[in-house]
Swiss-Prot record:
PANTHER family: AMINO-ACID PERMEASE 2 (PTHR45649:SF9), AMINO-ACID PERMEASE BAT1 (PTHR45649). The lineage of its organism: Eukaryota, Fungi, Dikarya, Ascomycota, Taphrinomycotina. Pfam families: AA_permease_2. It comes from Schizosaccharomyces pombe (strain 972 / ATCC 24843). The keyword Flavoprotein does not apply. InterPro entries: AA/rel_permease1 (IPR002293), AA_permease (IPR004756), Amino_acid_permease_CS (IPR004840). Keywords: Amino-acid transport, Glycoprotein, Golgi apparatus, Membrane, Transmembrane, Transmembrane helix, Transport. One of its GO terms (molecular function) is amino acid transmembrane transporter activity. This is Uncharacterized amino-acid permease C15C4.04c. Belongs to the amino acid-polyamine-organocation (APC) superfamily.
């Protein structure tokens, strides 16, 4: 067994000097049980040690479960169902079809760039951790701080918006069962949303073994539902729309001019569906051969989502009829649920709306699982108020249960904005896309700018010669769409339909900066090493 070289260590295996240990971290190789107070089980844990972290999770996610997790985070079938109103309002059927194709290409560039970095740094910190090696030392703490808070906000907004959609779909199914006699209200949606988030918190309080079992069969189930739904729509549709109507007949009802500009708001559906690319990274410490399996899962899952999502949008466009107003203003609150009702009747629409609800439940579970790991990893680096509490691992389940329930409380609070108006909740969808994508492209941009100078070493999964081109397009695309996602999607603008994404973003970032300047900057040094820090043992109880 190799020993620790070039690092000053005392008899108890503690670094004599924090800065010396940090600067010599890359010299840390395989560490034996006799040299530290924890056991190294395999090469995966040795790699984690080289990155500076104690292995504390069990690696119980199989190859299929890892792919299924990555695929579930998009919730393709259900997320298209719940966000189809955006392209319909911005440009009708052509917006749904072409926005998916165009925006999906940009999203794929982000996903592949993220997968590349996940391979190089397979830790629960995700892209936040990469700042340690991709940003010059002087700027690293503040850049890592901003990236971490953006990722945390984006993950929370992802859970909130997913579970809001979950509540909408469940109540839409109830409405269909009453032949539209029952119409959901804001208060009903908020109440069901809170119950759904609590349920997802309970599921995520289970052990990793149970989470693996729950996740494992999801991908097969999801793909079967998607294919069967498309077949049923095509088989039962009494009259298809023309190719001209589907691909070229742009009809904008957003109030924005020119129509070409209005068309761009359809990108939000794609950006919300194809995001949270690094969710798989947040369970990297629970995956065997994570440096290969995690990026493979991200790339494959997003590629399938991109292709099948485009096909599904085309099928919906051909079968939805031509009365856009009735779809957009449907009492069900979901245009696709109305399409199901029109084409498949009461029983068929109930079946696929309920299946959408089940699928997006899985998305909510995996999104919360990823966000809990984000909170845990960020707390490990002492970047949150009261980090010592959120960093605890439950000894029975070996999962961050306290972080899960912090997530539950925050996400419910975030969704209370929906009590004001249904339109106001749009801000949470926008925040999810903007915050997450910027938490990705900042490290990607740093890799482009500083990677060569800082001797960046790619992982076993990388893009080779195409890396710089894909990375650059990902950065440019994110900068472009972020401007669109901060704007109101309809005009004239009123307090009810205003896009409050900028308020949510500014509020959370302002809090993080105040916390930074009020004292965190003195103690926060960026992603920390903890290979020998007994005081940060996540299994210790208070």
């Amino acid at each position: 067994m190799d020993s620790v070289s070039n690092v000053s260590v005392n008899e108890q295996g503690k670094f004599n000097d924090k800065e010396e240990g940090f600067s010599n971290l890359k010299s840390l190789k395989h560490v034996s049980h006799s040299e530290t107070d924890f056991e190294v089980s395999n090469d995966e844990d040795n790699q984690l040690l080289e990155l500076g972290y104690k292995p504390v999770f069990k690696r119980e996610f199989s190859t299929w479960a890892t792919f299924s997790f990555a695929f579930s985070i998009s919730g393709l079938f259900a997320t298209v169902v719940t966000t189809y109103s955006y392209p319909l309002i911005s440009g009708g059927a052509p917006s749904a079809v072409w926005c998916w194709l165009i925006a999906g290409a940009g999203c794929m560039c982000i996903a592949l760039s993220v997968a590349e970095l996940v391979s190089a740094y397979p830790t629960s910190g995700g892209l936040y951790f990469t700042c340690k090696d991709l940003v010059p030392a002087r700027s690293m703490p503040v850049v890592a701080w901003v990236v971490g808070w953006l990722n945390l906000l984006g993950q929370a907004a992802g859970v909130s918006s997913t579970d809001w959609s979950c509540a909408q779909l469940l109540l839409a199914a109830v409405s269909i069962s009453t032949d539209l006699k029952y119409i959901p209200t804001n208060q009903h949606i908020v109440g069901v949303m809170a119950a759904v988030i609590v349920f997802h918190g309970l599921v995520n309080s289970l052990s990793t073994r149970w989470l693996d079992r729950i996740t494992r069969f999801y991908a097969t189930f999801h793909l079967i539902v998607l294919v069967v739904c498309m077949i049923c729509l095509l088989a039962k549709c009494p009259k298809f729309n023309t190719g001209k109507y589907v691909f070229t007949d742009v009809q904008a009802s957003s109030g924005w001019h020119p129509i070409g500009f209005s068309f761009l708001f359809g990108f939000l559906s794609v950006a919300w569906c194809m995001t949270d690319y690094d969710a798989t990274a947040h369970i990297a410490e629970e995956i065997e051969n994570a440096a290969v399996r995690a990026p493979n899962a991200i790339a494959l899952a997003l590629s399938i989502t991109y292709v099948l999502g485009w096909v599904f949008n085309i099928v919906l466009a051909f079968t939805m009829g031509t009365d856009l107003d009735s779809l957009i203003n449907s009492e069900l609150g979901q245009p696709v649920a109305q399409i199901f009702y029109n084409v498949l009747g009461k029983k068929g629409s109930m079946a696929f709306t309920i299946l959408s609800f089940i699928i997006i439940n899985f998305t909510g579970i995996t999104a919360m699982q990823a966000n809990a790991r984000t909170i845990w990893a960020f707390s490990r680096d002492q970047a949150l108020p009261f980090s010592r509490y959120w960093y605890k691992i439950n000894k029975t389940t070996t999962t961050p249960v306290i972080a899960v329930w912090l997530n539950v409380v925050f996400c419910i609070a975030l969704n209370l904005i929906g009590l004001g108006s249904i339109e106001a909740i749009e801000a949470i969808f926008s925040v999810c896309a903007i915050a997450l994508d910027w938490s990705y492209v900042i490290p990607i941009a740093c890799k482009l700018i500083f990677g060569k100078r800082l001797n960046y070493k790619p992982g076993p999964w990388n893009l080779g010669w195409a890396s710089h081109f894909v990375n650059a397009y990902a950065v440019c695309w994110t900068a472009f769409v972020s401007v669109i996602f901060l704007m109101p999607t309809v005009r004239p603008v009123t307090p009810q339909n205003m896009n409050y994404a900028v308020v949510v973003l500014a509020g959370v970032l302002l809090f993080s900066l105040v916390y930074w300047w009020s004292g965190a900057r003195k103690s926060y040094i960026g992603p920390r090493i903890n290979v020998d820090m007994e005081s940060e043992d996540p299994f210790k109880t208070e």
